[in-house]
Amino acid sequence: EDINYQLAQNDDKTAIFEGWCDFLNYFDASIRFQFSFLNLYGGHDAMEQSILVPLRGDAFDEIRAEYSGMLKTQLAKGNNGLKKTRYITFGIEADSYRVAKQRLERIELDILHNFKQLGVAAAPLSGKDRLRLMHAIFRMGSSEEAFRFDWKLLPATGLSTKNFIAPSSFEFRNGRWFRMGKRFGAVSFLSILAPELNDRMLADFLDIQSSLIVSMHIQSIDQNEAIKAIKRKITDLDRMKIEEQKKAVRSGYDMDIIPSDLATYGGEAKSLLKELQSRNERMFLVTFLIVNTGETKQQLENDAFQAAGIAQKYN
């Protein structure tokens, strides 16, 4: 889907973008959700096994073997074993476990249906799948320690699931970086200063050839509360505009000359209010985080510097 979007004509890109806008507008203020984009080294051998086409002992085995060989060749000269996956995590608050379970199941079905409408293949993760994923995240894809887990082991050993996924150690002595097992890591947040962000920014982050995690924590704001908040902001801006005009009159220059920031922010706020009221758009609070990791501090610094350059380019 990423490749389809990048190669599409502008009209098709607009249609895809609007489809994703509709997808996001499904989430009301009661649902908290997060997109996670993972670039992890999954182990070359495991990836090679996953792409092989099994032989079936018929006349087409020669074609299957040739196709498998072609895939192995592409893998060898492709992404250096970097496995890219995407996840959506969502949660709600409820008065009881039963109510929460029923609603989460309904939301899950709706999300899967909405993904299908977008042409995106998606599948839910089981409890063991989630543990396997967290095990990989804590090691950033390193295959040094295999994931070994069975639910039957919990009552027999007295251990919890944390014992099966936790790395050998955590270290948070430094304010700029941390250690997770043998790897160094750093978390950066994106301050969104531009009025619009280019649709290439996320793709460029994920094109960094190293283990990283990009996450977007998203909270929809209640429609009425969002409209009230924007109206209060417009009122504040109008009040500041009046104060600036009074200063201009007292200083003897044209009262229509006001700071450009006031004019810009006022126009953007009114445009946002119009979209919320007339186009049924939603307002979201977004926290954009990037986790860079490296086997050495120098590698970590290099990757973090590259990510900062991308943020500066588009923001």
What do these predicted ranges mean?
Residues 1-315:
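Extended, folded cores of ATP/NTP-driven motor/assembly subunits in large transport
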